[in-house]
Amino acid sequence: MFGVDLHTHSFISDGTLSPEQLVQAALDLKIQTLALTDHDTMDGLERAQDYAQDHDIKIISGVEISSQWSRPSTKKSYGVHIVALNMQDEVPIKVMLENQKKVRAERAKLIFELL
């Protein structure tokens, strides 16, 4: 049997486990391939990969990108999440994710102010 989970989150975004704990939980469930797809960040990837080096599990780089899609005919906007796998840690991606991080921080600040 070959266990795969291609959509997971650590506490770096909205999960509850550290990247290392997430890898260990996957191992406990006999998962052999795991993608860490935190929201708008790849900051936990290195930690997951480092932990996985001593274990029998493959880590796939990934990210869940928050986006907006607008329907021109109704002028409505919809939140869309795009799971991207096998992401390379290159400058254009880093810039985009840093921008996303700023947008998420501003959104969190606005939500907090409304409480």
Q: What annotation goes with each model-predicted range?
A:
Residues 1-79:
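An N-terminally biased module of ancient metal coordination in phosphate/nucleic-acid-related enzymes
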Residues 53-114:
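Extended substrate/RNA-proximal surfaces in nucleic-acid metabolism proteins
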